[in-house]
UniProtKB/Swiss-Prot annotation:
InterPro entries cross-referenced by the UniProt entry: ARM-like, ARM-type_fold, HEAT, HEAT_type_2, PP2A/SF3B1-like_HEAT, PP2A_Regulatory_Subunit_A
Keyword check for Iron-sulfur: no
N-acetylserine found at: 2
Family per record: Belongs to the phosphatase 2A regulatory subunit A family.
Protein name, per record: Serine/threonine-protein phosphatase 2A 65 kDa regulatory subunit A gamma isoform
Gene behind the chain: PP2AA3
Species the sequence originates in: Arabidopsis thaliana (Mouse-ear cress)
Main localisation: cytoplasm
More about this protein: Due to the stability of its transcription, PubMed:16166256 proposed this gene as a reference gene for transcript normalization.
Cellular component annotations (GO), alphabetically ordered: cytosol; extracellular region; nucleus; plant-type cell wall; plasma membrane; protein phosphatase type 2A complex
Superkingdom of the organism of origin: Eukaryota
Domain comment as written in the entry: Each HEAT repeat appears to consist of two alpha helices joined by a hydrophilic region, the intrarepeat loop. The repeat units may be arranged laterally to form a rod-like structure.
Length: 587
């Protein structure tokens, strides 16, 4: 083969592989379409590669999905925006295939390209494509059509706009529920491009059709449209057209529709204004909180704080809190868990007095819940309550429960408590901490679960930073060093880790006098894992202590370890010795 032909050779291979029987090869080639296009140049890409892709009737969904994705970013390779329209035919074909994810990606790419196209090209090429898909024999084409109307509409002349609105209306009444679902899903996007005069007539007419659909899968997607349309309409129109629909939906016979309402309701409050919220939406939300279907209560409970933020505190206390109290003892653990994940956020909304009177008892009952996730969700948000009621009240009312949870049988709960301790310590102050929580922090170092022991070691470091080296020297270091001879080597490893974390906080003097001797003793341990961890630790201590200490205490210890029978111990000891030499050379 001549030298001239050489650069074209890999491209020829890639093009051949587009037709290869092996799926993986076809896929690799499709993912390199941009390389092929760059090699062919813009004109040949337009005239040869794109037509080839349009005719490519590959039957593998993975290949088609990759093609749909690649073509979305292909404008650059066909000669820029003025030639963007040449990419539409292959994507039109892809948007009619059976596999949903391929169609969705093709629609995404059509929208990406359409958003960059010139207005004249949109009218000449993109809008006819939308019309063809809308009239497609297979429902797959009509489903895809719904997703591109918001791109086609804005640049169309008035006559064409009228036609597009009419076509979308027909899609909303299509025989196939899959098409009506797509029309409901995309109605908000389409509505955002429509002039306000037509919004109140054409779009609201389509919306009404969808809200009265006999398929609950269509109605629940129409619920999502409520919030989107509500933001586009004037408040009075929203009250007239959207509010009655939402109130009806909140009592729909299908729990899936009610579930969607529970998820969306708080967004509508802003659209309709305070008075309709008070008279219509608050009772609707209270109904959903007490719904007979657990899934609906879960959705409603998860939005309780967001909903209460929109109301004034009196309304929340009067109408929502009684339902919240009921939910805190709900028969479904998932409802209680959803409530626990957000209820702490109600404290800033309701204020100090209402929190103390109404919320604290609920917090306490959830902290003692039999289901660990419920307890976990409360613990992780305690700081939100502390900001409202102050640490004294928090410690009196909730601390006994927190101390109890520190020994919880579920390790994730213990872990959440440990991670909360430094924050609690900083707010409780040193005296309170020593009395109530100090012993717990030591106890965790000998937990059965590795993650707890590791978190406990990190916790000691954070406490030493919070209360200072003097306090740590009195309350942490002696207790930690006592444990370094624990019979179980895994616990000895934890103590070593705690020592290595404390050393930078404690400073050179305490490290040399108290911590380093304990580490050197540990270097004579019978377990190789301990010894190589000592070697790693020594390396981290080099920057903390004086050069004389490094030479007189650390180096001899490492030299001894570098002659250990165990290969890992020797490796880490030599690494640490290398570090010492590097420090010596640089100084």
């Amino acid at each position: 083969m001549s030298m001239v032909d050489e650069p074209l050779y890999p491209i020829a291979v890639l093009i051949d592989e587009l037709k290869n029987d092996d799926i993986q090869r076809r896929l690799n080639s499709i993912k390199r379409l941009s390389i092929i296009a760059r090699a062919l140049g813009e004109e040949r890409t337009r005239k040869e590669l794109i037509p080839f892709l349009s005719e490519n009737n590959d039957d593998d969904d993975e290949v088609l999905l990759a093609m749909a994705e690649e073509l979305g970013g292909f404008i650059l390779y066909v000669g820029g925006v003025e030639y963007a329209y040449v990419l539409l035919p292959p994507l039109e074909t892809l948007s009619t295939v059976e596999e949903t994810c391929v169609r969705e990606k093709a629609v995404d790419s059509l929208c990406r390209i359409g958003a960059q196209m010139r207005e004249s090209d949109l009218v000449e090429h993109f809008t006819p494509l939308a019309k063809r898909l809308s009239a497609g024999e297979w429902f797959t084409a009509r489903v895809s059509a719904c997703g591109i109307f918001h791109i086609a509409y804005p640049s169309a002349p008035d006559v064409l706009k009228t036609e597009l609105r009419s076509i979308y209306g027909q899609l909303c009444q299509d025989d196939m529920p899959m098409v009506r679902r797509a029309a409901a899903t995309n109605l908000g996007k389409f509505a955002a491009t429509i002039e306000s005069a037509h919004l109140k007539t054409d779009i609201m007419s389509m919306f009404e059709d969808l809200t009265q659909d006999d398929q609950d899968s269509v109605r629940l997607l129409a619920v999502e449209g409520c919030a989107a349309l509500g933001k586009l309409l004037e408040p009075q129109d929203c009250v007239a057209h959207i509010l009655p629909v939402i109130v009806n939906f909140s009592q729909d016979k299908s729990w899936r529709v009610r579930y969607m309402v529970a998820n969306q309701l708080y967004e509508l409050c802003e659209a309709v204004g305070p008075e309709p919220t008070r008279t219509d939406l608050v009772p609707a939300y209270a109904r959903l909180l007490c719904d007979n279907e657990a899934e609906v209560r879960i959705a409603a409970a998860g939005k309780v704080t967001k909903f209460c933020r929109i109301l004034n505190p009196e309304l929340a206390i009067q109408h929502i809190l009684p339902c919240v109290k009921e939910l805190s003892s709900d028969s479904s653990q998932h409802v209680r868990s959803a409530l626990a994940s957000v209820i702490m956020g109600m404290a800033p909304v309701l204020g100090k007095d209402a929190t103390i009177e109404h919320l604290l008892p609920i917090f306490l009952s959830l902290l003692k819940d039999e289901f660990p996730d419920v307890r976990l969700n409360i613990i992780s948000k305690l700081d939100q309550v502390n900001q409202v009621i102050g640490i004294d009240l928090l410690s009196q009312s909730l601390l006994p429960a927190i101390v109890e949870l520190a020994e919880d049988r579920h390790w994730r709960v213990r872990l959440a408590i440990i991670e909360y301790i430094p924050l609690l310590a900083s707010q409780l102050g040193v005296g309170f901490f020593d009395e109530k929580l100090g012993a717990l922090c030591m106890q965790w170092l000998q937990d059965k679960v590795h993650s707890i022991r590791e978190a406990a070691a990190n916790n000691l470091k954070r406490l030493a930073e919070e209360f200072g080296p003097e306090w740590a020297m009195q309350h942490i270091v002696p207790q930690v060093l006592e444990m370094i001879n624990n019979p179980h080597y895994l616990y000895r490893m934890t103590i070593l880790r705690a020592v290595s974390l404390l050393a930078p906080v404690m400073g050179s003097e305490i490290t040399c006098s108290k911590l380093l001797p304990a580490v050197i003793t540990a270097s004579k341990d019978r377990v190789p894992n301990i010894k190589f961890n000592v070697a790693k630790m020594m390396q981290s201590l080099i920057p903390i202590v004086d050069q004389a200490v490094v030479e007189n205490m650390i180096r001899p210890c490492l030299v001894e370890l570098s002659e250990d029978p165990d290969v890992d111990v020797r490796y880490f000891a030599n690494q640490a010795l290398q570090s010492i030499d590097n420090v010596m050379m640089s100084s």
